[in-house]
Each structure stands twice: as C-alpha cells, then as structure tokens.
Design a protein with these regions (language model features):
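N-terminal signal-anchor module of multipass membrane proteins
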Residues: 1-99, 215-222, 231-239, 332, ...
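C-terminal ends of transmembrane helices
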Residues: 90-102, 145-155, 232-237, 283-286
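Aromatic-anchored segments of alpha-helical transmembrane domains
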Residues: 91-92, 144-145, 170-176, 252-260, ...
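A structural feature that tracks compact, well-ordered secondary-structure segments
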Residues: 94-109, 114-125, 258-289
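Membrane-interface helix-loop-helix junctions at boundaries between adjacent transmembrane segments
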Residues: 106-109, 113-193
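Loop-to-transmembrane alpha-helix initiation sites
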Residues: 132-135, 158-166, 270-275, 295-299, ...
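Generic multipass alpha-helical transmembrane bundles of integral membrane proteins
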Residues: 163-238, 242-252
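Central hydrophobic cores of alpha-helical transmembrane segments
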Residues: 166-170, 247-254, 295-306, 328
Length: 372
C-alpha cells in the first residue's frame, strides 16, 4: 500500500526538482554567492568577475556573465581579452584600496573597467593584437574604480547607483587625450548619426531593420553580429525574462526614434541606434516594480534615451567623439530621481534583489515552492 501511495508523487517530485534547479541557476543565484563566501580566493574572484560582466547590462548572475563572455569570445577573442583585462584591473584596484568585500565579490567594481577596455579596443585604429593597448586598458580600468569609489558616497545620499558614469568619463578623457593621430594609440573618429550617407540610400530594408533591433542588445557589449547578440539576450533572459522583453522593446523604440530623425541607415541596421534605448528601458525594469505605470515609464525613458543619444552623438560627433552610453546614464538617473507618489511607491531601493528576476516570478507563481 505504501508503494502505491508514493508512486503518484514521483512526477510532482521531479517537477519540484526541476523548478528547484531552475531557481538555483536563475535570478541572482544568491545560494551560490553564499556558498562561495568561505572558498579559496581564486574561486571567489571567478564568481565576482562573472557577476561583474553581467553587471554591464544590469544583471547579477554568474551564469549570465559566462554566456556574455562566450559571446565576446565568439565576436572577437581580442576584444574578450581586453574586456577581461579591464575587469581584472578595476577589481584588483578595488581590493588594493580596501573596498567593501561584498561589493567587490558582487562585481560592482568590475563592469566599468570592462566597458572602458572594450570601447578602447573598438575605437583603436591599430588593429587587433596591438599589445601597446594593454597599458591604457589597465590604467583605464583602474581609473574607473577610483571614480566609482569617489562617486558612491555622493550618489548614495539620493539612493542612486554609480552606474556607468566612470566608464563614460574615462573613455571620453582617453579619446580626447589620444586623438586620431597619436603615434602609439591612434583611434577611429566617431561619426555623427545625422551625417549624410556616403551613397544615396532611400529604400529601407525591413529585415535588416528588425535585425538591428536584436543587434541593439549586443551593441551594449560592442557586439555587432547576430550570434553573440543572441547569446547576450539569452543571458538576460536567464536572469529575467521581463528584462529580456524590455531590452528588445527599448531597442525597437530607439530604432523607431532614429527613423523619425532620419538617422543613417547604417546606424539603424548595426544596432548603434538601439542600445541606449534598450538600457533606458531596462533601468526602469530593474529599479521599479512592474505595473502599468512603470511600463509606460520604461517606454518614455527609452524614447528620451534615444533622442538624447541622437543629440549627443551629433554634438560630440563633430569633434570625432562618441556619445557612448551617456544618454541612458543621464536619463536613467533622472528617472530614478522622480518624486511623484504614484511612481515612488514602486521604486526599488538600490542594492535590493530584483523582483523581476526569473526566480522571483516562479516563486510568486507557485507559493508552495517556498518550502523547497
């Protein structure tokens, strides 16, 4: 009789095991983070670096970081090397300065260094495997940690994240200092998106435009091909399906904004018009609880980020400088400073777990899983 009673429970038990494994691998993977606290330093460093990679795109999941690293390797091994070197430089600088161990192990001091390194490689006109570039990559990565450490106490007063202010600042200073004719670190000049096309393109290719929406997510990591962009989108989905939708939604909105401003088709097709909108939309998804009000706010912020990016790109492009992610950074900060009571009640304090992560959605959908 006992055997007969236990038999019907097996499918339910397998389902619970599957959901438990899914919960362990998605969201912030807090159980793994707790488990790694007493492990050897190299293991903690690996986890912290993978989290730092995912922090670039507002995630906090080491598996997502591993997928993004695979995407970078697929896009360009040289770019992946530069990114990891910048990440390590900024992380070790934080350790040397004695920054909070929990913040270091969560990757909060790594992602700005990685972004600086990636964009130094993108704008370098010396080609791949130009080893002299490793020097500014290390120095730039370390500089982002100094800026992060300095800005954090100021921004904490308003419950604001440091975000990528250090990355944008260091990259801009580097490109202004080196210029396009530097004998050691020459760079490509950035082109304004509103500049005339080299040839007369009047017909819009819809398939390429739709592909550009996908590439807008990949361009957050300077990936301009479909395969790596898909891997990055999967990494976002692993952490939060809602954020993956927001990333595509923001990129699509930003692409439409680019069309309305007659942006060069090459910017639309390559995703360069979409990544600021994707980030702007995702910021709301990370720092606000999902509701119809915050959904409208995410759309509005994506539009604001897109038009701000076009304006800054046209302004800085005259000087041969990129606007990088200044637009999403500035508009995202303004959105987090909103004081209206109908939105303020949905605001998630900085540093709190993300309620749109995969694990949270599964738990709220199945209250019995709290017992697992």
């Amino acid at each position: 009789m006992d055997f007969g009673k236990n038999t019907p429970q097996r499918p339910g038990g397998l389902k619970q095991c599957f959901v438990s494994a899914l919960l362990y691998c998605t969201g912030e993977m807090q159980q793994l983070h707790t488990h790694m606290q007493d492990k050897f330093f190299p293991l903690q460093l690996v986890e912290g670096c993978l989290r730092g990679i995912s922090r670039v795109i507002l995630l906090n999941n080491p598996l997502s970081g591993a997928l993004i690293l695979a995407a970078l390797l697929l896009e360009s091994p040289w770019q992946a090397l530069l990114g990891m070197l910048g990440l390590l430089a900024s992380t070790f600088t934080a350790i040397i300065l004695g920054q909070d161990c929990e913040e270091v192990s969560s990757g909060l001091y790594g992602f700005n260094g990685m972004l600086v390194a990636l964009l130094m490689g993108v704008f370098s006109s010396a080609g791949d495997w130009y080893l002299w570039l490793l020097l500014p990559v290390c120095l730039g990565g370390a500089a982002t940690t100094f800026l992060s450490s300095s800005l954090a106490p100021v921004l904490d007063r308003w419950d604001l994240p440091v975000s990528v202010f250090p990355f944008n600042t260091v990259l801009l200073l580097y490109l202004v200092c080196t210029g396009t004719s530097n004998p050691f670190f020459p760079n490509h000049p950035a082109q304004p998106p509103g500049a005339p096309e080299s040839t007369n393109h009047t017909q819009l290719h819809v398939p390429q435009l739709l592909q550009g929406v996908m590439l807008g997510v990949g361009q957050i990591f300077a990936c301009g091909t479909v395969g790596p962009s898909l891997l990055i989108l999967v990494a976002v989905f692993l952490f939060s399906p809602i954020l993956a939708v927001y990333a595509l939604l923001g990129s699509g909105i930003s692409t439409i904004a680019g069309l309305s401003m007659s942006v060069q088709h090459s910017f639309l097709y390559s995703g360069l018009s979409g990544f600021n909108g994707a980030l702007g939309c995702m910021v709301v998804g990370v720092f606000y609880i999902l509701s119809w009000r915050t959904h409208l706010l995410s759309i509005a912020n994506a539009l604001l980020s897109a038009y701000t990016d076009i304006a800054l790109s046209n302004l800085l492009g005259v000087l041969g400088l990129p606007a990088s992610s200044w637009a999403a950074t500035l508009t995202g900060t303004l959105v987090l400073l909103l004081t209206g009571k109908n939105l303020k009640e949905y605001r998630i304090p900085t540093g709190k777990p993300d309620p749109v992560c995969f694990g949270y959605l599964l738990i709220t959908a199945s209250p019995k899983l709290h017992l697992l």
